[in-house]
Amino acid sequence: MQSTQISSTTVILPSEVIQPPQQSAVPSEFKNTLPSRLNLFEGFDQSFSELTNPYQPVIPLMQRESLLGASSYYSSPSQNQRSYQNHRQHSNPDTINLRSQQQKRKPRVLFTQHQVNELEERFKKQRYVTATEREELAQCLGLTATQVKIWFQNRRYKCKRLAQDRTLQLSQIPFNPMFASAFPFGINSFGTAPSSSSSGS
């Protein structure tokens, strides 16, 4: 009996044990596409949740990106304003030239009352002075020849501007016929006699 029982039993070897199927390795060409596919599913879930929620406003993707950019811009206005000012200062050549001129500009010379009086007296006599006369006048007043030259240039410009303003004021005065009727024979009648009357007498 024992021999028959042993022969009827089957021995299972370890190699024949059924093992679960091993997961095949993911090919390298599909590894790079997995994150993008996951992102697609996440975006689909988010869009699906927006559609199912009636109280949540649906915002398009382009508008959402613009709103995110606007929120990041207004989150730090001081930094954006500072960067804009720096860009404007560096990109504007007029500002750079103005700064360089202000840095190169020499301090204004203050003349004393004695120097101004002497220069005014000389200007009444002659409006243009030669280089030698400028040197002599500068030595007498304790100035440089360049300072004397600039003073005369400014004084001539001031005199010319005053003459133009006076002419403009006279041109704006309205004509008064009563003033003209006070001189029926003209203003020249009070002056020298005409040549015709003198020849007749």
Swiss-Prot record:
GO terms for cellular component: chromatin; nucleus. Residues 104-163 bind DNA. The keyword Metal-binding does not apply. One of its GO terms (molecular function) is DNA-binding transcription factor activity. It is found in: Nucleus. Signal peptide: none annotated. The keyword Hydrolase does not apply. InterPro entries: HD, HD_metazoa, Homeobox_CS, Homeobox_NK-like, Homeodomain-like_sf, HTH_motif. PROSITE patterns: HOMEOBOX_1 (PS00027), HOMEOBOX_2 (PS50071). Residues 72-94 are annotated as: Disordered. SMART domains: HOX. One of its GO terms (biological process) is nervous system development. Probable transcription factor that regulates neuronal differention, including synapse assembly of the cholinergic motor neuron M4. Activates expression of growth factor, neuropeptide and transcription factor genes, such as TGF-beta dbl-1, FMRFamide-like flp-5 and transcription repressor zag-1, in the M4 neuron. Required for pharynx peristalsis. Belongs to the NK-2 homeobox family. This is Homeobox protein ceh-28. The gene is ceh-28.
